[in-house]
């Protein structure tokens, strides 16, 4: 591994551990608790897609007329992540973005998707509608990074703040939820 990446991983290890072992996960004792978590976390799912699109804009060609820009390997990596995030295959074999799959999962467990759907519908450029103080602050931090247009900052937020962290975080949530929650989820149809 690149020594610079190792250095960053060492520096952020404590913070990653804090997120993965957050006491909030132990408080997921009912399906209602999971619904509430999802109703808040969905903004991070949307935010993740915004970071990814920021990387795509900075490191690949998204302009008309098209021109090849940047490193071929980086373009391929970014575009393959975009393909996976925007056009993955759901459990029924249909193409669907991860964001929309998350909304479907929210609906399946009875979580409210109205607020995030209104939020996304009303987003214009990078002027974000207000949600609540915590979500607004989280999104403002991301969009401050995106506004810099600096690929290394966007890539750092994407990689170390999302892509590298999310699998461990979800594993912790799922494991604790399986222990604490015995109610079946409702099937959205």
Predicted regions and their residues:
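Short, well-ordered alpha-helical segments
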Residues: 70-76
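Single conserved hydrophobic/aromatic residue that forms the stacking wall/gate
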Residues: 179-189
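Sequence termini and other peripheral, non-core segments
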Residues: 1-5, 11, 21, 117-122, ...
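Active-site-proximal alpha-helical scaffolds that flank and shape metal-associated catalytic sites
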Residues: 76-178
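Short, charge- and proline-biased low-complexity linear segments
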Residues: 58-66, 113-120
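Alpha-helical bundle segments that constitute or directly flank the non-heme di-iron/ferroxidase center
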Residues: 4-19, 29-65, 84-89, 145, ...
